[in-house]
Amino acid sequence: MTFASLSTPTTAAELRYLALGDSYTIGEGVAESARWPALLAQQLRADGIAMSAPRIIAQTGWTTDELSAAMDAAGPLGEWDFVSLLIGVNNQYRGRSVEDFRSEFSGLLTRAIQLARGRTDRVLVLAIPDWGVTPFAEGRNRANIATEVDAFNAVKRAICASRGVAFVDISAVSRKFGGQPTHLADDGLHPGPALYLEWARAARSVARARLPGGMGREWGGE
């Protein structure tokens, strides 16, 4: 999929949302409206929070350093009311070291906090899902994939805790549903709309506690 840096005009009252990531953020294989950042924004609006549609800087296959380079290339990104970050699966997939990831992820998180006007409470990080449960991993060592993904996520969790940034662990729900055809895109690897909805629900409960606004109706995905 081609690089995406998408945005929707906002009104003065809307909170500006920047979503940073890779294929999981751009929503490889699903419609734009089914991407988890788009679903999260919809859910937060249902809660009475004036959230804009997200600007997305993401591309399938990106590693931490490639996302950072793309942010540089995007020019001045300005300031945002809310920033999400989901990155790292391609570092693991390509066999890159956890130690290199630690340094690069820490740098990305610093940038995300800066983009959120220095407010750590306005940054949200999602865990890397375990792609080893998907049909794409057939013939591979699924146990090793799970162990490696857990190691990368442990780094993310620890860095977020040290910075006071929310870490949303989607590991359990991804392992529960990530291998089911009803929750997969056609490629047998990436999540489908149903799984992205689960991710958005997990992120919603964390995000809405950190954003100004009221509580609205419960989101049923309609």
List the predicted regions and their residue ranges:
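Serine-esterase "nucleophile elbow" of acetyl-processing enzymes
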Residues: 3-60, 70-79
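Alpha-helical cap/lid subdomain in secreted, periplasmic
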Residues: 50, 69-221
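Active-site-proximal substrate-binding core of FAD-dependent oxidoreductases
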Residues: 66
